[in-house]
A protein has these predicted regions:
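Acidic (Asp/Glu)-rich catalytic clusters
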Residues: 19-24, 41-58, 74-89, 126-131, ...
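Gly/Pro-rich active-site loop or hairpin
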Residues: 38-40, 70, 108-118, 179-237
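Active-site acidic/histidine proton-transfer and metal-coordination neighborhood
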Residues: 72-168
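Acidic-and-aromatic substrate-binding clefts and catalytic sites of carbohydrate-active enzymes
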Residues: 16, 33-45, 64-74, 145-150, ...
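Catalytic domains of carbohydrate-active enzymes, especially glycoside hydrolases
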Residues: 14-37, 86
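Boundary/entry segment of secreted carbohydrate-active catalytic domains
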Residues: 1-19
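Hydrophobic faces of well-ordered beta-strands that scaffold small-molecule active sites
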Residues: 5-11, 27-31, 56-59, 91-93, ...
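Acidic/histidine-rich catalytic cores of soluble enzymes
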Residues: 129-213
Length: 277
């Protein structure tokens, strides 16, 4: 996949027809592999048709990289087959935990920003990378409660990236959401990120549900302050692919296309910026 102004869209069943009939044409797609592994029938056929046309990124939900249990190698075997079958070059996961005592929590919960967490997660990431024989990109997640901390979130992420050798999926909206909810400057946070390790970027909408609380929903349009933070981020780093996340509350296709166009416009502007600086 080329890394120049590549703007992708999450592939969801609700908008599958738009991919099939060509009314929407992103540069690549992203899916949660858990939703498509070993899937046959009608939707398996649809998925194969779409992935024959568009490059695919896999963004996992259930690896639970922060859990205390051993890794689920049966799942990893199926995942490895999926990644190879569909020629997936980038696999990402959330920097969170989603299981406890081998029970799925059906949520992505934050990990305490502690040194023992850094050691534990870095070891697990190396094990995953060795098994899959490819790098893993971890995503900075949104969180809504206080997290037991011995270090800042940015130091936590940097330490894991350094110790594990993994890459970073930078979710710009999550930076904005956490900055608003936890009272830090999202621009300063971007300045501290290991931007040379970013494999791709997530952009999405959020919803304000209280004066002091916004939620990363993936069900709203991107707001202007997040576009501005995105623009700032691209000026600080080399070009990478950008993925528009929309998981529900889908607008008309023309509105999704407008968001993709807005992202591409900003990305192309920053390509030109880097070309002359």
């Amino acid at each position: 996949m080329k890394n120049h102004s590549q703007i992708g869209l999450g592939f969801r069943r609700e908008i599958a027809d738009a991919f099939l009939d060509g009314s929407i044409k992103p540069d690549f797609i992203e899916v949660a592999p858990e939703n498509w592994i070993e899937l046959g029938g009608y939707w398996g056929d649809v998925f194969r048709k779409v992935t024959e046309r568009l490059p695919l990124i896999a963004h996992g939900l259930s690896l639970s990289i922060g859990s205390p249990e051993e890794l689920d190698y049966e799942f990893l075997k199926k995942l490895k087959t999926f990644l190879r079958t569909f020629n997936v070059k980038v696999y990402s996961e959330h920097l969170s935990f989603a299981k406890f005592e081998n029970a799925h929590l059906f949520d992505l919960l934050p990990i305490p920003f502690r040194e023992d967490s850094v050691k534990h997660i870095s070891l697990r990431i190396r094990q995953v990378q060795d098994f899959l024989e490819m790098p893993l990109a971890i995503e900075n997640v949104s969180y809504y409660t206080s997290v037991e901390a011995e270090m800042s979130e940015s130091a936590f992420i940097n330490n894991i990236v350094t110790e594990s050798g993994c890459n970073l999926l930078l979710d710009v909206n999550n930076v904005f959401v956490n900055g608003s909810n936890h009272g830090y400057d999202p621009y300063q946070f971007i300045d501290t990120m290991p931007l040379d390790k970013v494999t791709y970027i997530h952009m999405a909408g959020h919803k304000r549900i209280a004066p002091d609380l916004i939620i990363d929903t993936h069900g709203e349009a991107i707001i202007e302050p997040v576009y501005q933070l995105f623009d700032y981020t691209l000026k600080k780093m080399n070009p990478v692919p950008v993925l528009l996340e929309r998981d529900f509350n889908f607008p008309e296709i023309k509105e999704l296309k407008a968001e993709l166009s807005a992202l591409k416009k900003i990305a192309n502007k920053n390509l030109n910026y880097h070309a002359i600086h």
